[in-house]
From Swiss-Prot:
This is Beta-1,4-galactosyltransferase 5. The gene is b4galt5. Its cofactor is Mn(2+). GO terms for biological process: carbohydrate metabolic process; dorsal/ventral axis specification; ganglioside biosynthetic process via lactosylceramide; glycoprotein biosynthetic process; glycosylation; otolith development; positive regulation of BMP signaling pathway; protein glycosylation. Disulfide bonds join 106-151, 222-241.
Length: 381
């Protein structure tokens, strides 16, 4: 074969390889962002863990140097270094057999809260979960509302779950979360906000809709924004309102139980009603996967709030494996995030319009809504 033909053939094969590689990359970045971001978050989390380990090692070395200096001088060194905030001694949980009266406010650290849970990811029908929960506690009422009767609930908490086509996940979430909240003696209600129509998934706008609908039912103290595929592993991860804004899902199994980055606010988070109104809720402009949690973090910081997180192993969650393709990537999120502060007063609870279809189910209130961009108009930014 002549040399110039061999060269053309190799060039063609090279171009074909580059085309295949680029189209595959675009598919994973745009159509299957969860796979790409899962590995990206793991790399970021590893970096944070390495920096934290180096910091702690440095503190330990410093302590040894200081102790040695005191020893040489023949004096005692009494100060104790605190290498990590998780080393601090927590308030103990109440002992078994502790009794409280119905007119007393429920304690926050009850003996019924056992700690690590046995997570069962096997699929189960929703009506089977309903039977199990009603058998365990008949006090669970329509709409997923419950309150304790052996003490006065300290907090009234609305759980908002954004939803589309995850019918196999809801029963698993309820099977674990409802009994945990009952053991925490919280008054709670579940709101599943289901997006209808063909627009890309808008998790943030669904949360805004859910907030407005939940506030029509009851004067809740706080709201928790809860992804349907996040299963808590420890019932001592208290869902009360006292330390909000709060990021609950600190350590997720698919990120190797590490925080992807310091500003990460996704999965499960919560704010008081007053805080959420003050920051104008979530942004409505994030269509598709990614960015809305980072924008919420920015809004919280702009308002001067400090986010708290559960210590140690309390913030562990497992993610239900997905058997279908996730939502498409929102490629415009970085542009919006750069203008978070300017957009905060324009885009959120105050510019949202919608027409919901509300139905009361046994374990939750379902809010079905068709979303479109003209439901939350905002000037060009």
């Amino acid at each position: 074969m002549p040399t110039h033909l061999r060269f053309r053939r190799r060039s063609f094969l090279g171009l074909l390889f580059l085309f295949s590689l680029s189209t595959s990359a675009l598919y994973f970045i745009y159509s299957a962002p969860g796979i790409v971001n899962e590995y990206l978050f793991m790399v970021q989390a590893r970096g944070i863990q390495i920096r934290e380990n180096v910091r702690n090692m440095g503190a330990q070395v410093l302590e040894q140097v200081v102790r040695s200096a005191y020893s040489i001088n023949g004096t005692d060194y009494t100060y104790e270094f605190n290498f990590s905030e998780t080393d601090a001694s927590p308030t103990p949980f109440l002992p078994e057999g502790f009794t409280y009266k119905p007119e007393q406010v429920c304690p926050e650290k009850l003996p019924s809260m056992k700690g690590r849970l046995k997570v069962n990811m096997s699929e189960i029908a929703l009506d089977e979960v309903e039977k199990l929960l009603k058998l365990n506690d008949p006090g669970l009422s329509v709409g997923g509302h419950w309150k304790p009767h052996d003490c006065r609930p300290r907090w009234k908490v609305a759980i908002l779950v954004p939803f589309r086509n995850r019918h196999e996940h809801l029963p698993i979430l309820f099977r674990h979360l409802i009994p945990a909240l009952q053991r925490q003696r919280l008054q709670f209600g579940f709101y599943v906000i289901e997006q209808a129509g063909n627009e890309p998934f808008n998790r943030a706008m669904l949360f805004n809709v859910g907030f407005k609908e939940a506030m029509k039912d009851l004067n809740w103290d706080c709201v928790i924004f809860h992804d349907v595929d996040h299963i808590l592993e420890n019932d001592r991860n208290y869902y009360g309102c006292g330390e909000m804004p709060r990021h609950f899902a600190v350590k997720l199994n698919k990120y190797s139980y590490m925080l992807p980055y310091e500003e990460f606010f996704g999965g499960v988070s919560g704010l008081t009603v007053k805080q959420f109104k003050r920051i104008n809720g979530f942004p409505n402009a994030f269509w598709g996967w990614g960015g809305e949690d980072d924008d919420l973090w920015n809004r919280v910081q702009f308002a001067g709030y400090k986010v708290s997180r559960p210590h140690g192993e309390l913030g562990r969650y497992m993610s239900i494996p997905h058997h279908h393709r996730g939502e498409v990537q929102f490629l415009g999120r970085y542009k919006l995030l750069r203008r978070s502060k300017e957009r905060q007063s324009l885009d959120g609870l105050n510019n949202l319009n919608y027409s919901p279809l509300v139905s009361r189910r046994s374990l939750y209130t379902n809010v079905s809504v068709t979303l479109s961009r003209d439901l939350a108009p905002v000037a060009d930014y």
